[in-house]
Curated annotation (Swiss-Prot):
UniProt-annotated stretches for the region Binds goat polyclonal antibodies (pAbs): 32-45, 55-86, 215-239
Taxonomic lineage from the root: Eukaryota, Viridiplantae, Streptophyta, Embryophyta, Tracheophyta
Region (Linear epitope): 265-289
Name of the protein this chain belongs to: 11S globulin seed storage protein Ana o 2.0101
Start and end residues of each stretch annotated as Mouse monoclonal antibody (mAb) 2B5-binding: 34-57
Disulfide bond residue pairs: C25-C58, C101-C278
Region spans: IgE-binding: 15-29, 105-119
Provenance organism: Anacardium occidentale (Cashew)
Region (Mouse monoclonal antibody (mAb) 4H9-binding): 41-55
A GO biological process held by the record: protein homotrimerization
């Protein structure tokens, strides 16, 4: 099964599917969007942005936000599209079940009579802890669950890449539930929203009893005829699973990251199916300032997560950027060469301007905490913090997303001859030199010497 799974993954690597219909990205106005639908469950809520909005249709993605209360369990589910999950706040644990991979977490055997008695000790696949700032990657069709073991709510934002080649259905985001009776959070527009059911509900009870070799009474429990929904409270105020202690888990995570760093440093690669699938890294934290790729004191930082430092992203054809700007700081104008950028405000608010291929300003406003903004591929964008710190995360639809700056030391204009700029803009060569060399920052700059962005279109 592991071999088949590997072949399936490699068959999905070619490229994102060309789902876009003609004129689907002919957008003359962008908006910072709040979720359109909200569903409340026993131990949490699920919110979704309308996947049929023109911004999300252009980018080929769907977005959902989960809030899980303490001791809440997000029931097992999978999707028709690969997912990137960003943990906005909270901590907990998650299980991601790959077909064909061994159950490496096992309870200790109680005596040698266990096999003779016919009773089995529990065993399951690896459980991963998560915390604020973690990115969790989940391929299409892979089941996962999530549990809040902290004292405050867990909030996550999930991108579903419905245009990805791993999705061979249509562009409708689908959640397939293995338990519970959750509603379809993406179908708010339907006035008569049908009650959700899990996959087992659709099968014949007798057939399932034969498949599991249990009685029909137990199968009826699998069909979950209750009203708790998709996020439920765990009995006894604790989810009892097999896992290392917190200190052991943290040490293991650190040693795993050090091992990966060492392999990258010496150019080594993992080899073997078990290492590629069953023990691959699915999680990385991008909230630590020490991991910043671009950092300017008192201005801000940018941290990039792509297929170079989390290899599974090559399979998913996705990447992520985390940004932090301090008061009045600026991300220099740029465009994304090979991806759409889906911006989610994590903290504070920032001023953003986006310009299309006609030179029209299609967005000029604020992106606040909890809002989403799509910046289509090649549209130029600039971000600026206002009177407070602004934090955001950008999901990008390419595993090695690239940007091209319009200003600064590495800008596209800086790579052109002065004479070209002088003739293009009808300016002197001295002014052309100012355009090329006045700002020697590469990506981030302080707002002290810059003028406010004006409405001088």
């Amino acid at each position: 099964l592991s071999v088949c799974f590997l072949i399936l993954f490699h068959g999905c690597l070619a490229s994102r599917q060309e789902w876009q219909q003609q004129d689907e990205c002919q957008i003359d106005r962008l908006d910072a969007l709040e979720p359109d639908n909200r569903v409340e469950y026993e131990a949490g809520t699920v919110e979704a942005w309308d996947p049929n909005h023109e911004q999300f249709r252009c980018a080929g993605v769907a977005l959902v936000r989960h809030t899980i209360q303490p001791n809440g369990l997000l029931l097992p589910q999978y999707s028709n599209a690969p997912q990137l999950i960003y943990v906005v706040q909270g901590e907990g644990m998650t299980g991601i079940s790959y077909p064909g991979c061994p159950e490496t977490y096992q309870a200790p055997q109680q005596g040698r009579q266990q096999g003779q008695s016919g009773r089995f000790q529990d065993r399951h696949q690896k459980i991963r802890r998560f915390r604020r700032g973690d990115i969790i990657a989940i391929p299409a069709g892979v089941a996962h669950w999530c549990y809040n073991e902290g004292n405050s709510p867990v909030v996550t934002v999930t991108l579903l890449d419905v245009s990805n080649s791993q999705n061979q259905l249509d562009r409708t985001p689908r959640k397939f539930h293995l338990a519970g009776n959750p509603k379809d959070v993406f179908q708010q527009q339907q006035q008569h929203q049908s009650r959700g059911r899990n996959l087992f509900s659709g099968f014949d009870t007798e057939l399932l009893a034969e498949a599991f070799q249990v009685d029909e009474r137990l199968i009826k429990q699998l069909k979950s005829e209750d009203n708790r929904g998709g996020i439920v409270k765990v009995k006894d105020d604790e989810l009892r699973v097999i896992r290392p202690s917190r200190s052991q888990s943290e040490r293991g995570s650190e040693s795993e990251e050090e091992s990966e760093d060492e392999k990258r440093r010496w150019g080594q690669r993992d080899n073997g199916i078990e290492e590629t699938i069953c023990t691959m890294r699915l999680k990385e934290n991008i909230n630590d300032p020490a991991r910043a790729d671009i950092y300017t004191p008192e201005v801000g930082r940018l941290t990039t997560l792509n297929s170079l430092n989390l290899p599974i992203l090559k399979w998913l054809q996705l990447s992520v950027e985390k940004g932090v700007l301090y008061k009045n700081a600026l991300v220099l104008p740029h465009w994304n060469l090979n991806s759409h950028s889906i911006i989610y405000g994590c903290k504070g608010k920032g001023q953003v301007q986006v310009v299309d291929n006609f030179g029209n300003r299609v967005f000029d406003g604020e992106v606040r905490e909890g809002q989403m903004l799509v910046v289509p591929q090649n549209f130029a964008v600039v971000k600026r913090a206002r009177e407070e710190r602004f934090e955001w995360i950008s999901f990008k639809t390419n595993d090695r997303a690239m940007t091209s700056p319009l200003a600064g030391r590495t800008s596209v204009l800086g790579g052109m001859p002065e004479e070209v700029l002088a003739n293009a803009f009808q300016i002197s060569r001295e002014d052309a030199r100012k355009i090329k060399f006045n700002n020697q920052q590469t990506t981030l700059t302080s707002g002290e010497s810059s003028h406010h962005m004006r409405d001088d279109a």
